[in-house]
Amino acid sequence: MSEAGHKFLAKLGKKRLRPGGKRATDWLIAEGGFSKEKRILEVACNRGTTAIELAQRFGCKITAVDMDAQALEVAKKSAETAGVGHLIRFERANAMKLPYEDASFDIVINEAMLTMQADQAKKKCVMEYLRVLKPEGLLLTHDVLLKEAKESVRQELSQAIHVNVGPLTQDGWEQVM
């Protein structure tokens, strides 16, 4: 079986393992109103690149979760090396069943992970994000948007990155949200 595309790219040293790269992450950060006082949850943090950047820039406390134990170990080491290990708590958790109390976070950030989920799972994830957000909290996310629904595009993308994907059109994303 072939290795998932994002894991292969990580082995090559690529740090931004999502569509949109640093530019999309920078847009989310600019929209976030991050500060030291805010409690942040990053879902699907992978190797912790965004969490580390947020901790360095804003000094905020971050909980960063992922399902990949190996990626979390890399993330922990990277955060320590960057001098922000005390600000970030890395945990293994499922986005569809987050182990946090209701209204726990000011900001939930999630980058290009929902596309990797089936449609019903996308909705479950978003419902969990909203559950753990405080009233007036902010959900920051970006993902793959199709101009038109074409099964051939989905299949081609899945084959290219060796992961079953489900990108949506604007209408599809609006239904999920």
Q: Residues of each region from the PLM?
A:
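Class I SAM-dependent methyltransferase Rossmann-like catalytic core
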Residues: 5-19
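Short, glycine-/aromatic-enriched active-site segment of Class I SAM-dependent methyltransferases
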Residues: 144-164
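Short alpha-helix
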Residues: 166-177
